[in-house]
C-alpha cells in the first residue's frame, strides 16, 4: 500500500515508527506545517518527498491512501480532501470537532465507497 502521512509531529512520527514494523507499506510523502522540520522527518525515515500542502502529496503518482496525524480542527476538512481525491484515509481521533463535520465525512465515505477509518 502506498500512503502519504500528514502531520510530521510526535503522532506522525509514532505512525512512521509503526509503519517500519509492517511489511508492504511505502510512505511516498510527508506533509507538515514547517518545511525544514518536515524535510528532516522525511529524510530520517527515508521518505522521498515532503511538502506543506496536502493536495500536493495526494496528487503524487501511486498514492492509494492517507494517514492524518494533524490537529483536530483539520481532521474533517482533510479527510474530505482525501476522499475527494479518491484516496482511502485513516484519521487520528477524533474524526471531527463537530457532529455536522463528522456527518459530512461519513456521507462522502458512503458516496465514494472508499475506506475512512478513525484510529486510536
Name these PLM-found stretches:
Residues 104-120:
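Rossmann-fold dehydrogenase core element
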Residues 6, 92, 119:
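Short hydrophobic "strand-cap" motifs at the C-terminus of beta-strands
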Residues 1-45:
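N-terminal Rossmann-like dinucleotide-binding module
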Residues 21, 84-86, 111:
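Residues at the C-terminal ends
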Residues 45-106:
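Beta-loop-alpha module in the N-terminal Rossmann-like domain of NAD(P)-dependent dehydrogenases
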Amino acid at each position: 500500500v502506498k500512503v502519504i502521512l500528514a502531520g510530521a509531529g510526535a503522532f506522525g512520527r509514532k505512525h512512521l515508527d509503526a509503519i517500519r514494523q509492517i511489511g508492504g507499506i511505502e510512505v511516498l510523502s510527508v506533509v507538515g506545517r514547517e518545511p525544514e522540520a518536515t524535510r528532516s522527518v522525511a529524510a530520517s525515515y527515508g521518505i522521498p518527498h515532503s511538502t506543506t500542502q496536502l493536495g500536493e502529496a495526494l496528487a503524487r503518482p501511486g498514492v492509494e491512501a492517507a494517514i492524518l496525524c494533524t490537529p483536530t480542527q483539520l481532521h474533517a476538512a482533510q479527510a474530505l480532501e482525501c476522499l475527494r481525491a479518491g484516496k482511502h484515509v485513516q484519521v487520528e481521533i477524533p474524526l471531527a470537532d463537530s457532529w455536522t463535520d463528522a456527518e459530512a465525512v461519513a456521507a462522502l465515505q458512503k458516496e465514494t465507497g472508499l475506506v475512512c477509518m478513525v484510529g486510536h
